[in-house]
Amino acid sequence: MRTNTTLPRRSLRPGRNIALPVVLTALLASCGAPGAQSPLSDTPTDVSTSIGDEPVTLDVLVSTPDVPLYEALGEAFQAEHPDVTVQVTGEDFNSLTTNVPRLISGTEVPDLVRLASFGNLVEDKLLTNLDPYAEAYGWTAWPQSQFASTRVGDDGRQRGTGHLYGAGPGFGLTGIYYNKSLAEQIGMSEPPATLGDLEESMQKAKDAGLLPMMVNGKDGGLAYPLQNLQMNSADGTQVVQDWNYNTPGADIDTPALVDAATTLQGWSDEGYLPEDVNSIDQTQAPARFAEGEGVFFPSGNWQAPVLQEAGGGEIGFFLFPPDDAGEPFTAMTAAGVLAIPTRSDQHDVAAAFLDFIQTDDGARQSTLDLLGLPPGGPEDASLPDSEPGSLVAGTVESFQMLLESDGLVDFMSNSTASMHANTLVPQTQLLVAGKTSPAEFSAAIQKDYEEAEK
């Protein structure tokens, strides 16, 4: 399997060239299909579950951290379909999602692309409606909640309803990692049961000369505790879920978000966060945490395989605690979405790959082993193995618990195409730096949301 980890000028297929510039950001609203090209239809009229026996290349464009997983999935798919060559290309997540409209609106496009939000892509008919493939492969008989975030209404905006435009191998889950040895030093024998317990532990860590919480503020890690604090203050997930799914009239500029921003800013003021929090990215944060910098690290299950190996059994995981003991836990989740660009000429092969990564036992195991993501798929599909008591097993157990209790909600970052890089990242940086107030922060989030939805 051929693999690239950067995006130089290259030929996606012999004789076909595209300049690929650098699965949540700007430009989506302004980049539609070029007017010189023929009108698009996003719904295939002739689909097949047979991919034939002619040699073909399937180009898969994902974020760089996902490359090892898709390399493994591609190799497994090639073993089943030797006439298919899966070519995986990786790019920085923010850069990739910023440039998705350009990457899929030309005549030379990847066959599968990692998405985090849909923006104008559905409205501009740049993504393939997967409903015909869902019928052909039997996805319609699977639990449908797994597809909620990748359904888009006829208005091209509201999610959770309408046609299916994406699917993926597994699901993310947020929570808090903790260093067991450092926790023992501050007298913490079990994960905090309430937000107050967590804050008390962070104060003890500071008093002991330890960094209370490692966070990657450079590329959005501050949004994880922020959203959990918002859901705690709002007494549930409905407000933020309606907002995430672009439900008409949804508004996040509420006392709950102001309260959440106030708490997060307070953590910074108290010295609970790294002094250089706004320059720490998602590669540096887990590495520094695994080396013993920080008692706590809010992040997602995609970090579990690496931290399990690097931490030597000294790292645990717990769900973000509620305000009061006994209240339900909540967490953010999203499918690792792959979409088929309308202009791809390998729709059937791409759909076959999507079906394979959701149903093949080996592919499902790789999804958990390499990226820590519990797979979706058919209700009767076998569950991947994880070592009892391991960090990965702990994240899987947490996911199953929240799945059953309806405590999972999409990421605020996925609400619009520009929300992550253009709004949440810079606004949370300003917040923890003390350069904006909680009320100004809350208003700015809603303002940018409304601007993106125009």
Residue ranges of predicted features:
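Hinge/lid segment of periplasmic solute-binding proteins
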Residues: 118-174, 225, 316-318
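Extracytoplasmic "Venus flytrap"/periplasmic binding protein-like
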Residues: 76-149, 184-186, 190-193, 288, ...
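Short, low-complexity disordered leader/linker segments with a strong preference
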Residues: 1-58, 79, 450-454
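Glycine-centered hinge/linker elements that transmit conformational signals in sensory
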Residues: 245-277
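Extracytoplasmic/periplasmic substrate-recognition and gating elements
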Residues: 79, 162, 186, 270, ...
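C-terminal capping/gating helix-and-loop segments adjacent to ligand/active sites or protein-protein/ligand interfaces
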Residues: 246, 331, 393-449
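Extracytoplasmic/periplasmic solute-binding protein
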Residues: 159-169, 174, 199-249, 294
